[in-house]
């Protein structure tokens, strides 16, 4: 019991095995380790956390696969660079471990790799244990998870993590067992076993392939082999049939790339019984692929044909045509207007173009279906003619990337955000305003030998699934693609650059060379955007992005090129080379599917993406890439362009001018961002709808909306919103009625102080200075009359007769209450009005503590409010180890730090010693609250709950 961590370990054991309410340090607590992304839990995340902080590691697992290595490849590379040693022991048991994975592990200089050879004498080998040593402590994860992608991300797995000193009995037994297995004569080093094992593995794979082939040959006719719709396709078909029964004639299928839109349409056509079908595309290659898909669904029972530049099968029942060919007058007029019962428009975001409009205006089918993964692609919209409008705002089914991954419709991807060379930034990527000499210099940087070598090294380390690489590389411009292709070829890769100038035949030939293994093979095709959509190349197993992210939509389009499932393809690798780009913040937005543009959500996904992403996919950023994204988030100032994009998209989708609450309900941009930029939603509408008739509001009406948007819209508490809601319907309400309503709706009783504070706030008294006091003194909403009832003012009643003003008030109430119920209507922490780990501004703290006015301008590191004291901490700040220094970059140098997940060390302000009134305000407060923000650029603080003081002592810095 003399170990320095004994007490912490005992507390951890008590929490884990005796009383879960017992407080203990998470670092010393046993845990149940399992996979459930909805709970933010994955075995992979636990492994990465332990690998990141360990001094050495030992792993003994029965099975290691290539996908398992891929999931851990970035952290393993980092450990190699740090020189952290590791020993990994696997086995030939069941010949399951993949030689490719073992080869990749053996490349790492810090890892010793052995294989335990099984036989009838020693029996099987089925261990699954991960041992991590950090200084004198061991973190050990033992259970059911092998080092396979499924086991550490997706499968139902049960593992236990224990924490022990080296002297602990269980740790000793585990370490001894590992040592015995490692030193066993049956354990061979990589060089000793690999050739023999590869031969053994190959023979085993040949047998398995023969068994699969034999099983396939048992299928003798088309009916037996008939394709069946997946879960997404079934839901789409059911919705479509309901729509048709209601007489709906147009609809959209919005489905993420790779989820099977073409097959979905074929199944729907089969179910609805259409005999004459037009399938319209914008490229020959896509028409050919669509025809093949339909043939797999219908077999030989339907006559199908192409109408393209080279094919003219006008007599077919199902026609697959290119828009360029069919839009010609002489070709259209070959058909009666009602010839087709169903017209299907692939990549329907192009339907606003004149050529599509010509075809759509000509035909009068019973039903028109549009299909796209990118309905909001802004460059495809023409004023007054957007995709939603074209298809009458009917969405038959929508499935986004996250949902598609949950449903296992896509190939898992492993995304790696890798730091590009320091020289790669926005100046290089966007050189339109530069001189010829500057452009030439930028071109040299983008195509430098150093960059070529760096890209090749990363691509070869992170690898691909399958026998050989079949990759796409996206570049900023075609000149760059051509030069990079030339240099890659000089260094041994087989690549080809393609552009829009290349013919369909050249493109088709390039794709054939890329995917087929028995012709003049290509490793990579380089392009700018011709592969961003449409072309179906399921075999793609690596995508390299050598350009800045221009939008989440384009990012997902390019990522999506690798997401189609294919035989012998277990996963796709996405390598994103991240330069110093201002748009880097769009990367986590695209990956997460979170369109709120909430900065904290963006940061969270960069740090914790692996615990949140569905399925076996993984997300990794190296440390410099993380910082580049964080900097892009911090430097994101004006959001007006993003607001406009979100507004336009939502308006198009709804077919009307959206309300503020619509953004919230449709998961568009965070309405709080709109208010920060425009002060009121009405002001934003006026800015957006310059050609639309938005009713004017009086100055006093605008003032009320601005004040309410600033104070109560965020929904941190509901009573002001609820009282306002009551006063929209009733001329007056009693205090008892108001109390009862709040109690019934929100489950808590307002005391008289809270009621008085609510009334004062709605009277305009929550202000920060004399200027605001004078400004908001004009707020005329309510009064307390002689009967002690809360009554609307007559001037407010007159304002309510204005429909636009009433509409805006209803919107504030609706959104504010929605937000309260979703974020703040939880069990409050020990009777205080704060929710653990939610975010609050200094203004919110004043608001929730019933302050008579906004004190946020005088709330710095500490504020005492009656019996409560609040500590406000900025966690990431520049510091110096020089104890004689008081300031860093003009700011006080505080040493605020988490010593553990339970103990926080806080420095008072300079010159505020232990006996100062400042310090005594903290020490003597009955309730003490800790609020932390990560960076100065953030406005809000995370509420980390109440704390007790363990020790008060002079700080290292003078007078703290």
Regions flagged by a language model, labelled:
Residues 288, 306, 311-312, 331, ...:
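Conserved helicase ATPase core of P-loop NTP-dependent helicases/translocases
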Residues 203-229, 240, 441-442, 451-454, ...:
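Long, largely alpha-helical accessory region at the distal end of helicase-like NTP-driven motors
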Residues 552-557, 561-591:
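Conserved segment of the helicase C-terminal RecA-like domain
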Residues 393-471:
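Conserved interdomain linker/interface between the two RecA-like ATPase lobes of SF2 helicase motors
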């Amino acid at each position: 019991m003399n170990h320095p961590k004994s007490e912490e370990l005992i507390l951890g054991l008590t929490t884990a095995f005796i009383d879960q309410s017992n407080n203990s340090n998470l670092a010393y607590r046993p845990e149940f380790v399992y996979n459930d992304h909805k709970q933010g839990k994955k075995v992979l995340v636990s492994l990465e956390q332990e690998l990141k902080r360990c001094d050495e590691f030992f792993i003994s697992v029965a099975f290691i696969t290539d996908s398992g290595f891929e999931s851990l490849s970035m952290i393993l590379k980092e450990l190699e660079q740090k020189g952290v040693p590791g020993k990994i022991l696997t086995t030939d048991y069941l010949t399951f471990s993949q030689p490719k994975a073992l080869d990749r592990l053996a490349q790492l200089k810090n890892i010793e790799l052995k294989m335990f050879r099984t036989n009838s004498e020693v029996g099987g080998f089925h261990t699954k244990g991960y041992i991590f040593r950090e200084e004198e402590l061991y973190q050990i994860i033992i259970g059911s998870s092998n080092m396979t992608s499924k086991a550490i991300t997706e499968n139902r797995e049960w593992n236990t993590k224990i924490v022990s000193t080296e002297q602990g009995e269980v740790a000793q037994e585990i370490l001894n067992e590992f040592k015995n297995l490692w030193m066993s004569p049956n354990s061979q080093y990589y060089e000793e076993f690999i050739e023999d094992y590869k031969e053994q593995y190959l023979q085993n794979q040949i047998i398995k392939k023969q068994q699969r082939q034999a099983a396939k040959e048992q299928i003798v006719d088309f009916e037996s082999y008939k394709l069946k719709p997946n879960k997404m396709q079934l839901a789409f078909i059911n919705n479509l049939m309901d729509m048709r029964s209601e007489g709906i004639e147009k609809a959209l299928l919005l489905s993420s790339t790779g989820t099977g839109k073409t097959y979905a349409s074929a199944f729907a056509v089969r179910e609805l019984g259409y005999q004459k079908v037009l399938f319209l595309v914008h490229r020959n290659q896509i028409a050919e692929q669509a025809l093949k898909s339909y043939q797999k669904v219908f077999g030989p029972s339907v006559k199908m044909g192409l109408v393209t530049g080279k094919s003219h099968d006008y007599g077919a029942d199902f026609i697959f045509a290119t828009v360029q060919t069919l839009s010609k007058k002489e070709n259209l007029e070959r058909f009666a207007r009602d010839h087709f019962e169903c017209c299907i428009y692939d990549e329907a975001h192009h339907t606003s173009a004149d050529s599509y409009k010509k075809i759509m205006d000509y035909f009068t089918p019973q039903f028109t279906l549009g299909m796209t993964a990118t309905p909001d692609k802004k460059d495809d919209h023409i004023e007054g003619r957007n995709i939603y409008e074209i298809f009458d705002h009917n969405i038959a089914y929508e499935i986004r990337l996250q949902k598609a991954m949950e449903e296992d419709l896509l190939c898992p991807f492993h995304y790696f955000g890798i730091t590009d060379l320091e020289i790669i930034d926005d100046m290089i990527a966007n050189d339109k305003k530069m001189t010829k000499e500057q452009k030439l210099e930028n071109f040299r940087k983008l195509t430098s030998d150093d960059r070529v070598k760096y890209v090749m090294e990363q691509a070869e380390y992170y690898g691909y699934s399958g026998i050989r690489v079949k990759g796409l590389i996206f570049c900023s411009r075609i000149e760059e693609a051509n030069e990079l292709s030339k240099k890659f070829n000089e260094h041994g890769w087989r690549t080809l650059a393609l552009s829009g100038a290349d013919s369909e035949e050249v493109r088709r030939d390039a794709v054939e060379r890329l995917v087929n293994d028995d012709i003049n093979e290509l490793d990579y095709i380089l392009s700018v955007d011709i592969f961003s959509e449409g072309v179906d190349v399921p075999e793609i197993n690596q995508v390299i992005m050598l350009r800045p992210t221009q939008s989440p939509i384009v990012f997902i389009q390019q990522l999506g090129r690798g997401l189609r499932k294919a035989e012998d393809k277990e996963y796709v690798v996405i390598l994103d080379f991240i330069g110093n780009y201002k748009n880097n913040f769009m990367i986590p937005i695209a990956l997460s599917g979170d369109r709120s543009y909430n900065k904290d959500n963006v940061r969270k996904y960069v740090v914790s993406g692996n615990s949140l992403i569905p399925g076996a996919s993984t997300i990794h950023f190296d440390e410099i890439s993380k910082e580049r994204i964080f900097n892009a988030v911090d430097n994101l100032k004006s959001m007006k362009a993003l607001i406009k994009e979100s507004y336009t998209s939502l308006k198009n989708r709804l077919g009307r001018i959206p309300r503020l609450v619509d953004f919230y309900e449709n998961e568009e941009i965070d309405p709080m961002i709109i208010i920060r930029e425009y002060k009121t939603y009405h002001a934003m509408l006026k800015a957006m709808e310059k050609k639309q008739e938005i009713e004017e509001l009086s100055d006093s009406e605008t003032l009320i909306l601005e004040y309410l948007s600033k104070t109560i819209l965020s929904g941190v508490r509901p009573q002001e919103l609820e009282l306002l809601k009551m006063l929209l319907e009733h001329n007056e309400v009693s205090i008892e009625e108001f109390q009862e309503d709040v109690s019934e709706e929100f489950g808590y009783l307002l005391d008289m102080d809270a009621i008085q504070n609510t009334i004062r706030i709605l009277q305009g008294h929550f202000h920060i200075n004399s200027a605001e006091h004078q400004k908001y003194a004009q707020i005329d909403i309510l009064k307390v009359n002689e009967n002690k009832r809360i009554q609307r003012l007559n001037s407010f009643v007159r304002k309510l007769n204005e429909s636009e003003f009433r509409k805006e008030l209803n919107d504030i109430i609706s959104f504010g209450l929605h937000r309260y119920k979703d974020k703040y209507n939880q069990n409050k922490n020990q009777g205080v009005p704060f929710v653990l780990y939610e975010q609050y501004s200094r203004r919110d703290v004043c608001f929730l503590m019933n302050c008579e006015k906004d004190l946020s301008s005088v709330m710095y590191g500490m504020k005492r409010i009656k019996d409560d004291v609040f500590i406000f901490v900025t966690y990431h700040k520049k510091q110096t180890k020089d104890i004689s220094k008081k300031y860093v970059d003009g700011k006080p140098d505080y040493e605020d730090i988490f010593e553990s997940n339970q103990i926080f060390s806080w420095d008072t302000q300079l010159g505020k010693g232990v006996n100062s009134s400042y310090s005594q305000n903290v020490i003597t407060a009955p309730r003490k609250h800790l609020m932390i923000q990560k960076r100065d650029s953030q406005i809000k603080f995370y509420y980390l709950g109440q704390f007790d003081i363990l020790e008060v002592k002079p700080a290292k810095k003078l007078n703290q």
